[in-house]
């Protein structure tokens, strides 16, 4: 009995060659629309879909394969006489292979000028229906949705006259993943169109970007997936120019670092990060000086860290950086000389380029945190703040220099693990106290790291001070200016302590917990 294949593809890469090989193996080819035209023009004999259905393609191609003669040929079980008799009685010929890929819905909605009507017209109906019918009946039918699978199917057909059950099952699984992802994108698009912020069902779709050797630890399996609708300003979209593949921990740290530097876009800034916490942030009039400040913030912790710069890396900056062991450098661009310096000196240094012109688009993305049996979803902590909205709650007002330093410190504290404390001046971090289970311990840790650089320093806290003992510790160290959200039932005690020691303290009214 002659084998039949139905081919209907929007991505025509390799389809002519695939069809030609099937013809050599004696297969009969049914085809639709533009696919049939492409095959006919290449000299591949095909049967029109309307010759199979008895109905013409209609309604601008919306209806062409939704017919019992197609789906009966796909769904009939070859091991059930009743199915085969029903097919024979209704003059339905069996279809043994389906090659379908779908209307380019994703590519359509990514176009900057896409209209709602364009998006709707690129929702495929017949294609997913054929794919699902064939995949359901994979015991008898081979289904191909990915051109990358053409070769393995041809090899098995040439060698054995049919594909193996294992191959059919694997291809069916790929189809169901593919159609689920396709529908998820459509659901996401329509959900956004109607402004639904809390849908009762949430389906996320990601594409495998990189299999990983292991996860956070060697005993943990891991892979890296990228959003199906990519975000330009993200570690997943960065272009790697040198070095080994990024590890699981590299990716998490790099993501944290590029989030930080979004808040410092107005001036040349360098962020150094280790284990998801900033260990140095430097800001200056030029990127070379900003690097020096970031390095001097903590010359010990930066060893083996990740550095992100928000300006092009020049040769002078590269010369200074290459003397420090770093895991990753990320910048918008590099001069040819700078890149040569970094690569020649550090063959394994991971160097990435990430354009910073899409930062604001990245801020609207939701954050997903997995818990056992569930998923937490929240907006990113990107609230727009202005010093004009802050309140000086002490008798003493900040000096101009202190005000600048407090603003710098407040940007930085958002990214320190809670309970988080940071000590800075107006252009660099001096001490970081992350992740302690009581706030006064974080205060002591940050102050101890800043040590003899406390003259003129300020301190920021990611949340309110529950007791005045924090202010006592700060005053004892000689720090004269504090910024914190406020909001404790004991705020007045902290204010009185600050006044007692002649400190200035600013309340922002916004908490920045980070877990």
Curated annotation (Swiss-Prot):
Task: Extract one GO BP annotation from the record.
Answer: 'de novo' IMP biosynthetic process
Q: Has keyword Hydrolase?
A: yes
Gene Ontology MF term list: IMP cyclohydrolase activity; phosphoribosylaminoimidazolecarboxamide formyltransferase activity
Known EC number(s)? 2.1.2.3, 3.5.4.10
UniProt pathway annotation: Purine metabolism; IMP biosynthesis via de novo pathway; 5-formamido-1-(5-phospho-D-ribosyl)imidazole-4-carboxamide from 5-amino-1-(5-phospho-D-ribosyl)imidazole-4-carboxamide (10-formyl THF route): step 1/1; Purine metabolism; IMP biosynthesis via de novo pathway; IMP from 5-formamido-1-(5-phospho-D-ribosyl)imidazole-4-carboxamide: step 1/1
InterPro entries linked to this entry: AICAR_Tfase_dup_dom_sf (IPR024051), Cytidine_deaminase-like (IPR016193), MGS-like_dom (IPR011607), MGS-like_dom_sf (IPR036914), PurH-like (IPR002695)
Keyword Hydrolase in record: yes
Q: Name one GO cellular component term.
A: cytosol
Q: Which reaction does it catalyse?
A: (6R)-10-formyltetrahydrofolate + 5-amino-1-(5-phospho-beta-D-ribosyl)imidazole-4-carboxamide = 5-formamido-1-(5-phospho-D-ribosyl)imidazole-4-carboxamide + (6S)-5,6,7,8-tetrahydrofolate; IMP + H2O = 5-formamido-1-(5-phospho-D-ribosyl)imidazole-4-carboxamide
Q: Which keywords belong to this entry?
A: Hydrolase, Multifunctional enzyme, Purine biosynthesis, Transferase
Q: MGS-like domain: which residues? A: 1-145
Question: What's in the domain note?
Answer: The IMP cyclohydrolase activity resides in the N-terminal region.
Annotated PANTHER family? BIFUNCTIONAL PURINE BIOSYNTHESIS PROTEIN ATIC, BIFUNCTIONAL PURINE BIOSYNTHESIS PROTEIN PURH
Could you say which protein family the record assigns here? Answer: Belongs to the PurH family.
Q: Which NCBIfam families match?
A: PRK00881.1, purH
Q: What is this protein called?
A: Bifunctional purine biosynthesis protein PurH
Q: Which organism is it from?
A: Streptococcus pneumoniae (strain P1031)
The gene behind this protein is purH
């Amino acid at each position: 009995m002659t084998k039949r294949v139905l081919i209907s593809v929007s991505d025509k890469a390799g389809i002519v060659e695939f069809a030609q090989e099937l013809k050599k193996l004696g297969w009969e080819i049914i085809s639709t629309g533009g696919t049939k035209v492409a095959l006919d023009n290449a000299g591949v004999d095909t049967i029109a879909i309307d010759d199979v259905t008895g109905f013409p393609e209609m309604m601008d191609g919306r209806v062409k394969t939704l017919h019992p003669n197609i789906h009966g040929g796909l769904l009939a079980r070859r091991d059930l006489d009743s199915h085969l008799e029903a097919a024979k009685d209704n003059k339905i010929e069996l279809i043994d292979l389906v090659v379908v890929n779908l209307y380019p819905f994703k590519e359509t909605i990514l176009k900057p000028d896409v209209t709602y009507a364009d998006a709707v017209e690129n929702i495929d109906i017949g294609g997913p229906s054929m794919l699902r019918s064939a995949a359901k009946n994979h015991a008898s039918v081979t289904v191909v949705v990915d051109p990358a699978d053409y070769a393995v199917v041809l090899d098995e057909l040439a060698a054995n006259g049919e594909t193996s059950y294992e191959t059919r099952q694997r291809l069916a699984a790929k189809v169901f993943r593919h159609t689920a992802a396709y529908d998820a994108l459509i659901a996401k698009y329509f959900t956004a169109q109607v402004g639904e912020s809390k849908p009762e069902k949430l389906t996320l779709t990601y594409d495998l970007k990189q299999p990983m050797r292991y996860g956070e630890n060697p005993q943990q399996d891991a892979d890296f997936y990228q959003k199906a609708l990519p975000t330009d300003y993200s570690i997943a979209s960065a272009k790697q120019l040198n070095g080994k593949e990024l590890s699981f921990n590299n990716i998490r740290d790099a993501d944290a670092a590029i989030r930080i530097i979004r808040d410092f876009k107005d001036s040349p800034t360098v962020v150094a990060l280790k284990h998801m916490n900033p260990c140095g942030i430097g800001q200056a009039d030029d990127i070379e000086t900003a690097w020096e400040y970031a390095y001097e913030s903590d010359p010990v912790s930066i060893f083996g860290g990740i550095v992100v710069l928000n300006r092009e890396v020049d040769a002078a900056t590269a010369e200074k950086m290459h003397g420090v062991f770093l895991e990753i450098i990320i910048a918008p661009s590099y001069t040819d000389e700078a890149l040569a310096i970094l690569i020649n000196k550090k063959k394994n240094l991971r160097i990435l380029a990430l354009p910073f012109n899409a930062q604001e688009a990245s801020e609207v993305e939701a954050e997903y945190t997995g818990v056992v049996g569930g998923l937490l979803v929240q907006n990113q902590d990107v609230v727009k703040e202005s010093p004009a909205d802050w309140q000086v709650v002490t008798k003493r007002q900040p000096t101009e220099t202190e005000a600048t330093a407090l603003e710098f410190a407040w940007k930085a504290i958002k990214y320190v693990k809670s309970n988080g404390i940071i000590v800075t001046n107006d252009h660099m971090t001096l001490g970081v106290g992350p992740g302690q289970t009581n706030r006064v311990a974080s205060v002591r840790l940050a102050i101890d790291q800043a040590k003899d650089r406390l003259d003129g320093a300020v301190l920021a806290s990611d949340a309110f001070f529950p007791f005045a003992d924090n202010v006592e510790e700060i005053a004892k160290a000689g720090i004269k200016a504090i910024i914190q959200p406020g909001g404790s039932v004991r705020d007045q005690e902290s204010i009185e302590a600050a006044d007692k020691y002649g400190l200035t303290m600013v309340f922002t009214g916004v908490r920045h917990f980070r877990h």
